[in-house]
Amino acid sequence: MNEPKFIHLHVHSDYSMIDGLSKPEDLVKKAASLNMPAIAITDYNNLYGVIKFYNMAHKLGLKPIIGITVNFFSDLINNQLTKLTLLASTQEGYKNLILLISRAYQKGYVHNNHVTIEKKWFSEINKGLILLSGGPQGELGKVLLNGQSSLISICLSFYQKYFPDSYYLELFRTNRDNEETYLHLAVDLSLSTGVPIVATNDVCFLSQEDFKIHKIRIAINEGEILQHSKIQNNYSNQQFLKTTEEMSDLFSDIPEALINSVEIAKRCNVFIHSGKYFLPQFRTGKISVEKYLIKEAYKGIKKRLNSRYLDIEKYKDIYSQYINRLDMELTVINKMGFPGYFLIVMEFIQWAKDNNIPVGPGRGSGAGSLVAYALNITEVDPLSFNLLFERFLNPERISMPDFDIDFCMEKRDQVIDHVSEIYGKNAVAQIITFGTLTAKAVIRDVGRVLGYPYGFINKLSKLVPLDPGITLKEAFSKESELFNLYKNNEDVKNLIDIAKKLEGTNRNIGKHAGGVVISPTKITDFCPLYCDEKGNNPVTQFDKNDIEYIGLVKFDFLGLRTLTIISYAVEMINTKLNLNKKRTININSIPLDDAKCFKLLKNSETTGVFQLESYGMKDLIKRLQPDCFEDMIALVALFRPGPLQSGMVDNFINRKHGRENISYPDHKWQHILLKPILESTYGIILYQEQVMEIAQVLSGYTLGSADILRRAMSKKNLKDMSEQRAIFEEGASNNGIDKKLSIKIFDLLEKFAGYGFNKSHSVAYALVSYQTLWLKSHYPAEFIAAAMTSDIDNTEKIVILINESLNMGVKIIPPNINLSKYEFYVNDQGDIVYGLGAIKGIGKNSVQVLIKEREENKFFHDLFDLCMRIDSQKITRRVLEKLIMSGSCDCFDKNRNYLLQSIDDAINASKESFRIKSFKQDSLFGIFQNELNQVKKNNLVNLVCPEKNKLQNEYQVLGFYLTGHPINQYKKELECYVNGVKLSQLKFIKRNKKILVAGIIVSIKIKITKNKNRIAILVLDDNTSRLEVVIFTELLNAYESLVKLNKLLFVHGMLNVSFIDKNIKMTAYALIDLSVLRKKYINKLIIILNKEKTNIFFLNNLYECLDKQSKGNIPVFIFFDNKEVCLNKKLNKKWFVVITDDFLNKLKFLVGSKNIELKFN
């Protein structure tokens, strides 16, 4: 091969977030297509893409050169920000790159969202590094351009001292400001000092045509439209991956700069090794880690079995099954070199349990390990459910075991902190993730940057289906309207063509949901770190796949909210049981055949139950009628798109209920050997483990090789499948199985393998579902209180759970400042006491201050007492308002309006009290106390708070009506107007039928359609249920005055069912105001009077009330009744009235609610 003339040494990928556009792999592919023997990656302030770059380079036969572009503030030139590119020439150099950039993040040196290093670090971190000066943007470049000749030698001497023969003056020719001036100064300096020069192109994109895309990408990052973007002026259209010939022409006058790029490339020899795993050492004393694992596993399994089988001699056959399985697993684990992994996981799980941190019973294929069960890593006995160890750890396919562990959401970080303390903070980090421009997002971002109207952009992005991970190409095939617009609309084509080029580009960084790395030494011995702006919360700069490539082991510490619910519910239950000296419950020891549980389940009463509360799942439960734990395991596996769309679910249900004959697996193609494997699923191949067992039984596969078969089937690799088919047929033939039968069964396996679910995971999560179901069945109040507490900030979920509690006969005690805690809890009477933390606008700190004072100094007597005892800076006026509006202060006075009016007096009194106390003026305080008592008396004037206002305030701070409902005052009227139809009854009414409904408007959303028309989406609430109503443009425009929050509205419309959530919705055809229906249906108003109500003062008030409402069409009847006379008098037409809410409220105030009657047609 001819000697290369140029190598690109300064190249940015899209991991630079702004400076680069192309994927590292695409850069390497482009370099390979240009016959370049090597290429560098020098992303801006990170090494995110190094592993992907390195792998692709090796795959295509290119030499990968690893580098980084960094910033630092130069003390030579007034702390100006300067750039520098570093390349690793040796393994030590690569480690130094890692060390430098990690230290920058750990120190928290951040400037305009970019991290900076310190120049002085080079005095200790310099070996194996080659420095490119940064061109005009580098420290030396700025010194040259500033004409500071006295600083040149000082600057050079630093780099020559620490980087002898490894510091190069970097030259650009990309048509940017000052480049050519700098270049001539740098060349002159090189000639006079002997410092070598090197040509680079500061590459940011693949081809010249990509410059426009690059500018759009920058504008997206800035949040600007294209013409307002400022940073893009720092780039030119020449910063593409030029060919060797193009670079040679560009620097034909400075050939040395080209030659040096090749010489540098030759010097860079870094290898990133893979194929070996690096685990932290688990301390076992003098005993080997293998023997320690065996000892702990045996100890654990004996403890498990002794608690279950009290007479071991009687159950010795069962005992031997467990020991044989345990020995097999231990042999595999030790042979594969993973005993330390199991022990590490065992330790932090046991620590969590010892410290009252809830841990899940298992997750994923790890629940199939008996060793894990023995070590208390899982709570699932794999032998009881026929789970396979080889699905988790396959001796015939070497890969790391991978336990996914669920912890209580609120305490998960405590476990990570514990691990950090055990293995060292510098050896533990979470794992980075990268957010990319998705199909919907890229359309919106590109459209905004190009200045297209919002409606145009919104229409296009909404045409992209909601499928997770969908690409624009896939969207075209699924949405014909999008494709047609692309073909026929030039603006759409322009936007989409640009969006396609940006789709999938890295946009931001995040943190893996649960991935944690534990390294045997410092993380930075293996991988660079990224930290937040304060230098905290370290995450690896490599994603989970790259972490695995370099041999670090990922542990998944996942947060599961359901465990928090279970823990809190059990805590409340056991506290009460302890007080009553009763036996407490252990949620991991509850029977799995509880009749009460399955009764609740079969009735689909699963709101709040883990995994089983969605509409679709409830529908499946109704159809399946599960009556055993195996059915619950199947539920988890069946409720997925594959089984639901394939007809497998219908077959399963029909077979369970005898509507279809059970066969193993198909009535045409079955074998008796398959019955024990498929019996629990009624002959349906539902689980991946069943695929493996069938291969073992029919064709003599080992379970390890059967797992390889399963993987090949799920990946649908034609070459692998062809090989596996031949092995399967031969094995079946050797077992005397008919060839045609074996081929047909293989075909069935191949079909179902795509739908097959991991049974180990299904069992573990079904167990969590069952635990929540059991708690709901036996302790509904505690369970619902715990569930509401876990969603204390989610008003919508709390409303659902309150309705569920009422359906189950559990009473809700409204918030009470003297009884409530921050969270929901169950009192001694078995009622749920509303949590103060669920009140909108009240922070946790405020609630804790209240509760602390209450616990230390007993109940608050009134609002003044509350304000006297707590500093107004801790409990502000706004917080007091929210407490009163929510009803939390009803224990002081039921009249919330009076309390609201008293806030200022109470606060002022408390401030004066605190002021006087601070001066210790006891005599003055005595005088002041008398004045305070007078203030209280003055405020005892009864300020009437209408029920409507009270409930509206309550809704504002709670998100729903708790102590009443504004619709209650219309109860009798609604029985006439809507024939008593309640929203909760709509599920029993035929679809596509027009009906009149009523409810209070609790939510209004106005949306703009593709044609720029408005539609309204309302939510009506009638205290029995809620209904979403869609009002289209014409109707909305005509009746918009009726569409107001907290207003009673009557809607005549068509019922339908949402395809998304299966909820009943309505399309409105007519909106009707209450006044219209009152005028149409009320035919008389009856006012009942007695002797006490006939004094002159009362009659004057009644006269005034009727007079203001006269000139209506509704007759008024006065019914007078006492022992002496009975009179029923219709007033003349002059007194006919208009019925309004205000009028009725005034009448009720005058004569009482019971003395008013409305009569209807």
Swiss-Prot record:
GO biological processes: DNA replication
Catalytic activity reported: DNA(n) + a 2'-deoxyribonucleoside 5'-triphosphate = DNA(n+1) + diphosphate
Entry keyword Cytoplasm: yes
UniProt keyword Nucleotidyltransferase, yes or no: yes
Compartments in which it is found: Cytoplasm
Enzyme class: transferase
Pfam families registered for this protein in UniProt: DNA_pol3_alpha (PF07733), DNA_pol3_finger (PF17657), DNA_pol_IIIA_C (PF20914), HHH_6 (PF14579), PHP (PF02811), tRNA_anti-codon (PF01336)
Matching PANTHER family: DNA POLYMERASE III SUBUNIT ALPHA (PTHR32294:SF0)
Similarity remark: Belongs to the DNA polymerase type-C family. DnaE subfamily.
Protein name as it appears in the record: DNA polymerase III subunit alpha
